[in-house]
Each structure stands twice: as C-alpha cells, then as structure tokens.
Amino acid sequence: MKKLASELTVRRFRESDLDEVCELVRETIDTSYAAVYPPRVVDFFHQYHERPVVIADAASGHTIVVHSGGKLVATGTRAGTTVRRVFVRSAWQRRGIGQMMMAELESAALEAKIERLDLSASLPAKEFYLRLGYEVVSEEDYEVAPGQHLEYYEMAKALASAG
C-alpha cells in the first residue's frame, strides 16, 4: 500500500474490492459517457466492464485501486501490454489521480519488462491520454446498434526505461 497524498492511498486490487469497483465503473460510465455516446453504446460499455471481466483482468494483470477516507475513488488495470478500465469517480476527476494511476501502471509495466503499452480511448478520454504521451494509432467506429456508433481511438506509448 502506498500513500499518495494526505488523503489518497493506492494499492493492488483485492477480490473484496469487486463490488465497489463495478459500482465506480458503472457510475463513471453513466456520468461521463452518456453525454457523448448514444444509449446503446453506453449499454455496450456497461457490458464490456461486467464483473467477470473485471475479475479476469485483475487475475491476469495488474489492477490498482485508489481510496480516500475508505471510499474507492479510482481504479485502473494493465493486462499484458494493454491498459484497461481507468476510471476516476466524477467528483474526483481533474485532481491528478488518473495521471498518477497511469504512472503507476506504466512503472509496473517497465518492471515487467514491457516497453510499449496500448489502450482503447473513449471520446472523453482521448485528450487525457494525449497529454500523457500516448499517440493515436487508429480511429475506430463500431456500430453497436443501427445508427448507434461507438467511436474510439486505439492509442499506444513507448515507455522510457529509467536506466
């Protein structure tokens, strides 16, 4: 467990975190994506981040959680070379927590001898990842229902080893 600031603590995901992580992801999807994506796309995001997927990613990768005063405020996962499920509770966004989580996930990737990370960025997240040095590899458009498209970006970043 690592103290980030006087109020924040980061640690590895435990299975006992599952309900809170799923609730955080669902809430963040509802507040951040509903304004930019049509309803079926929001439903698609909910299905993509269901409990079995969260458990599988945590078991095969590196998932972290961030707490403040005992309340979960953020989570992020690296599964192999892919970053997934980086979510910060809406009330806690724009405080550097997402950037801190990405630094933690990138550091763990370097420790695992991974030199490049990739991710799929939603429309609201694209600028965040660009600021962190990720580059757009491709623009994607997936029709989840007639006339309802999931637009997103495949992005990647070469990690600089400290050596």
Regions found by a protein language model. Name each.
Residues 79-91, 99:
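Conserved acetyl-CoA binding element of GNAT-fold acetyltransferases
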Residues 94-107, 131:
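Conserved acetyl-CoA-binding loop-helix of GNAT-fold acetyltransferases
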Residues 14, 84, 89, 120-122:
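Residue-level recognition of the GNAT/N-acetyltransferase active site
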Residues 61-74:
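Conserved beta-hairpin
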Residues 115, 120-124, 132, 142-163:
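C-terminal "cap" of GNAT-fold acetyltransferases
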Residues 22, 26-52:
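Conserved GNAT-fold acetyl-CoA-binding loop/helix
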Residues 8-23:
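A short beta-loop-alpha structural element at the N-terminal edge
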